[in-house]
Amino acid sequence: MKISVIISTYNCGALIVKALCSLVSNQTPACELEVLVIDDGSIDNTRQIIKKFQAKVSFTLKYFYKKNGNWGSVINYVKENRLANGDWITVLDSDDTLKPNTLNKLANLVEKADYDLVVFDYTKCWKKIKLKIHTYPTWWKNMTRELQKQTPFCIPLGKFLKRNLFYKLPKLKEKVSFQDALYTASSLKLAKKVRHVNQSGGNYHFKRAGNSMSIPWNIKRFSAELDICKDLIRLNAQEIALVHLLRQQFRVQLKEKQIQLAVTRDFNFSGFSWYTRCFLWMVYQTMLKRYFYLQTTKQ
C-alpha cells in the first residue's frame, strides 16, 4: 500500500524538521511512503532543509516551490499536477506531527475493509497543554449517514482519503484562509464509508505564530470566515458553520454589519457526541440563534 503525505509549508523551516521526523518514525513495511513538500513561496531556508533530508531518508521525498497562494492553492496545485500517487492521501501542516504507529494502524484497517475516508482523533497542543480531541464519540466506528459524518473538529490532520476521493474534491479558494475546513467538509460529504479510529493520529499545534488561527481580526479575516460559513451551509454542514460563530470577534462584526446567515433547514446536532450536542444546542439557543434565519423555498 502506498501513502502520499502532502506537507504544506510557508516559512516554517524551523518547524518542518519535526514533521519530517514524525514520518521517519512512522515507516513500516506495510506502507510505501511518498512525501510531497509544497513550499507556498517561502523566503527562509526550507529548500535547504528538505535537500538535506532527501539525502538521509529511505522514502520518496519530493520538493515543489510555487508562488504564494495560501493553503487552498497548495491542494489545488497537487490536484492539478496529479502529484499524489498514493492509494491513500493525507495532509500534514509543517508545524504538526504524526503520532508513532499511525500509518501502521491505517494499513491494518484498510486491509480488512473498503473505506473512502479514515479519521483519527488528534492531540491539541497549546504551550504546555496537551488535550486529546475526540473527533467522534469514542464508540463510533463506521459512519454512513450525512449528518453523522459531520464533525466540528475539521482540521485535515489524521484524515486519510482514498486517492479517487481526493481527486474528486472541488477546487478550493486561493489567497484566503480557513480552506482546510472546506476541504474536510467536502471530503466527509463525498465519502460513502467513513471509519473513525479512537486513537490520536497526530499533534496539532494550536495558535502557533503565523498560522491561520493567529491572524488578527481585520476585514480580510472577517470576509474569509463569512465565506467559509456560507460554503459550509451550501454543503449541508450548517452545524459546522455554527462552530465558527463561537469566535467572539466574528460575532461582534456580524452584529455590527447586521448580517444573518441563511439556512434551509433546522439545526440538527444528533450526529454529534452527547456532550458536543448538548453544548452546541445550548449556545445555539442562548447566543447564536440570532445570527441565522430559516430561508423558505418557494414551491
Curated annotation (Swiss-Prot):
InterPro entries: Glyco_trans_2-like (IPR001173), Glycosyltransf_2 (IPR050834), Nucleotide-diphossugar_trans (IPR029044). This is Uncharacterized glycosyltransferase MG060 homolog. The keyword Glycosyltransferase applies. Keywords: Glycosyltransferase, Transferase. Belongs to the glycosyltransferase 2 family. One of its GO terms (molecular function) is glycosyltransferase activity. Its EC number is 2.4.-.-. Coiled coil: none annotated.
